[in-house]
Amino acid sequence: MEKARKQYSLWKDAPLPENLKKEAIAIQGDAEEIYDRFCRDMTFGTSGLRGKMGIGTNRINEIVIKRATMGVADYLLSKHEKPKVVIGYDTRKNSAAYAEETARTLAARGIDSYVFMQPVPVPAVSFGIRHMGADGGIMITASHNPKEYNGYHFPSRQMPGCLRQKNLRFPSLTEQLPLSPVPSG
């Protein structure tokens, strides 16, 4: 419970996007909600991250997307001199914004990205990887999960295996990366 309260305080006092700031204020006196949202950090599963959207380390939001992308960027830069990534998104709430945030974060790390200009199905990203000669792909989708959810999915066969092999876990990322905004590239 103490870890969750500390994380909540850090987030509440950080320069967050307006929507997350409002949520931080809304849950201020709700210990159960704070615990649920901040009790753990999301970890990369077999195909990425999936969860409810909202404020917290245990939710999908702009900060979690940035941090995940920074971890993916670090990995790609360790394997490729000038990596390229294809980014797609579905029609869910926030998917387009999360795709844009992903592209900005990659650009800030010197990674070129190709973002679809409209929502696409997951196979389109796999096609884009091959068509553009990219080193990986990211799809913003929660697949079959309810509308309150979103996700950060790796359609490329290479990326999930690479992440598992390197044991790239989200908790280790959150200890190293700040809550401050990622500069745009």
List each language-model region with its residue ranges.
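An N-terminal, well-structured beta->alpha segment
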Residues: 2-102
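Conserved short alpha-helical segments that host acidic/polar catalytic motifs at enzyme active sites
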Residues: 46, 107, 183
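Ferredoxin-reductase
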Residues: 9-11, 81-158
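Catalytic cores of nucleotide-enabled group-transfer and carboxylate-activating enzymes in metabolic
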Residues: 64-74, 95, 100-103, 112, ...
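Gly/Ser/Thr-enriched, mixed-charge loops and adjacent short helices
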Residues: 11, 15, 33-38, 42, ...
